[in-house]
């Protein structure tokens, strides 16, 4: 029997779920060139506008001149360089924890943390809307795996009653497709009451949230005791690439010993760590970036509500517009693109069937005038979409 890949691809096309890669032909930012077309983009996650910051670029350039362009080996062989170590110490300071550990990607950080902490005989409990990397990590861990209702501490409590072995509760901090925040105080309360551990992937919270950009844990004023395992990514608000896990001395040493995605891969380029050190400095010192971003979020939500768009409960840079039908979401995205606006349509299986949406992401690099252009485009295109047959 052969693999019938053509049939699988044809079925995905027929369901309006076929994915294609746009080709970016310019630096990342609000104004981009995609597939040869100049566009105003509202779909990247460079939340604080640091990816093209001159000081970050210069830090990378200087780092490459001093350290070269490759990690050269895994961290446990000879790939753990001075910039890596300095960045780990800076991330530990940002999170207020004793240690932090660098990973090459957010996916690897989540997979490494979960599989190092639980296995056969243990339990993993996850929010139904967690990122795919967290769900994959839970399934691959070998532990008993179950999902609780979205952001529902009571649903979690019922599953905690049936948990066996070491129990790890895992949640996104900011949910990437809805933009809402995990109810960390309630989740931490239920988790601690049962002697379990809470792990938070705050990929979208670091930078935009917290008085100093420390993310959702800082936002809620929680401690390491509340959230023993804290994950962050560096490819979003930090504007670079990579990820980290922050926590106790024992946690980080355990990950060094047992996290296979950490052990068996080459370290990130030291120059990348140099760039991230500079972006971290800017993230913590340039508070105007968070303030400007919040101004844009308020502007967008007010304008979208006036148009009659169905928004979700989010005060983060992620602002989904619920459409429902995947075909209509794709059509609206295409209409906006014809007007020079790039907003991505998100469809199943990334989101549940019947909940296709446009996912607007705002950044500190956007201006109020650019957000107004988006709102005007949405008003015109949404009115046109409503006048078209539902099968369009």
From Swiss-Prot:
Residues reported in the UniProt entry to bind pyridoxal 5'-phosphate: 106-107, 176, 204, 233
Named cofactor requirement(s): pyridoxal 5'-phosphate
UniProt pathway: Cofactor biosynthesis; biotin biosynthesis
InterPro entries reported for this sequence: Aminotrans_II_pyridoxalP_BS, Aminotransferase_I/II_large, AON_synthase_class-II, AONS_Archaea/Proteobacteria, AONS_Proteobacteria, PyrdxlP-dep_Trfase, PyrdxlP-dep_Trfase_major, PyrdxlP-dep_Trfase_small
Keyword match Transferase: yes
Keyword Plastid found: no
Catalytic activity: 6-carboxyhexanoyl-[ACP] + L-alanine + H(+) = (8S)-8-amino-7-oxononanoate + holo-[ACP] + CO2
Protein EC: 2.3.1.47
Annotated SUPFAM superfamilies: PLP-dependent transferases
Gene3D superfamilies: Aspartate Aminotransferase, domain 1, Type I PLP-dependent aspartate aminotransferase-like (Major domain)
A GO biological process held by the record: biotin biosynthetic process
Record PTM N6-(pyridoxal phosphate)lysine, positions in chain: 236
PROSITE patterns, per database record: AA_TRANSFER_CLASS_2
Alphabetized CDD domains for the sequence: KBL_like
Enzyme type, top EC level: transferase
Domain of life: Bacteria
Annotated keywords: Biotin biosynthesis, Pyridoxal phosphate, Transferase
Binding site residues for substrate: 19, 131, 350
GO terms, molecular function: 8-amino-7-oxononanoate synthase activity; pyridoxal phosphate binding
HAMAP family according to UniProt: BioF_aminotrans_2
Function comment: Catalyzes the decarboxylative condensation of pimeloyl-[acyl-carrier protein] and L-alanine to produce 8-amino-7-oxononanoate (AON), [acyl-carrier protein], and carbon dioxide.
Family to which the UniProt record says this protein belongs: Belongs to the class-II pyridoxal-phosphate-dependent aminotransferase family. BioF subfamily.
Family annotation (NCBIfam families): bioF
Subunit structure: Homodimer.
Protein name: 8-amino-7-oxononanoate synthase
Species, as recorded: Pseudomonas fluorescens (strain Pf0-1)
Gene name tied to this protein: bioF
């Amino acid at each position: 029997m052969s693999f019938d890949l053509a049939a699988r691809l044809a079925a995905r096309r027929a369901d309006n779920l076929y994915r294609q890669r746009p080709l970016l032909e310019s630096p990342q930012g609000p104004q981009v060139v995609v597939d040869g077309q100049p566009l105003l983009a509202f779909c990247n996650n460079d939340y604080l506008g640091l990816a093209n910051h001159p000081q970050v670029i210069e830090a990378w350039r200087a780092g490459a001149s001093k350290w070269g362009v490759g990690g050269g080996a895994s961290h446990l062989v000879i790939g753990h360089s001075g910039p890596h170590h300095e960045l780990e110490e800076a991330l530990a300071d940002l999170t207020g924890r004793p240690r932090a550990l660098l990973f090459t990607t957010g996916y690897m950080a989540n997979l490494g943390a979960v599989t190092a902490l639980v296995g056969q005989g243990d339990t993993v409990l996850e929010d139904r809307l967690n990122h795919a990397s967290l769900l994959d990590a839970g399934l691959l861990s070998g532990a008993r795996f179950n999902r609780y209702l979205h952001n529902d501490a009571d649903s979690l409590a019922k599953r905690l009653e049936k948990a066996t072995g070491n129990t790890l509760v895992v949640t996104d901090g900011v949910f990437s497709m809805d933009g809402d925040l995990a109810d960390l105080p309630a989740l931490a309360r239920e988790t601690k009451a049962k002697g379990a551990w809470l792990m938070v992937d705050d990929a979208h919270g670091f930078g935009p949230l917290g008085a100093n950009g420390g993310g959702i844990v800082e936002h809620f004023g929680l401690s390491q005791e509340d959230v023993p395992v804290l994950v962050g990514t560096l490819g979003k608000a930090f504007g670079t690439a990579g990820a980290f896990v922050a926590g106790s001395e024992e946690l980080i040493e355990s990950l060094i010993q047992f996290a296979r995605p950490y052990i068996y891969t080459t370290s990130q380029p030291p120059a990348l760590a140099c760039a991230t050190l500079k972006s971290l400095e800017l993230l913590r010192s340039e508070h105007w970036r968070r303030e400007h971003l919040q101004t844009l979020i308020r502007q967008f939500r007010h304008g979208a509500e006036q148009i009659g768009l169905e928004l979700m409960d989010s005060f983060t840079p992620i602002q989904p517009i619920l459409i429902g039908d995947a075909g209509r979401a794709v059509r609206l995205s295409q209409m906006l693109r014809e007007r020079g606006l790039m907003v991505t349509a998100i469809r199943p299986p990334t989101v549940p069937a019947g909940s296709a949406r446009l996912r607007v992401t705002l950044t500190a690099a956007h201006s109020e005038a650019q957000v107004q252009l988006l709102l005007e485009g949405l008003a015109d295109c949404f009115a046109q979409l409503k006048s078209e047959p539902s099968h369009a």
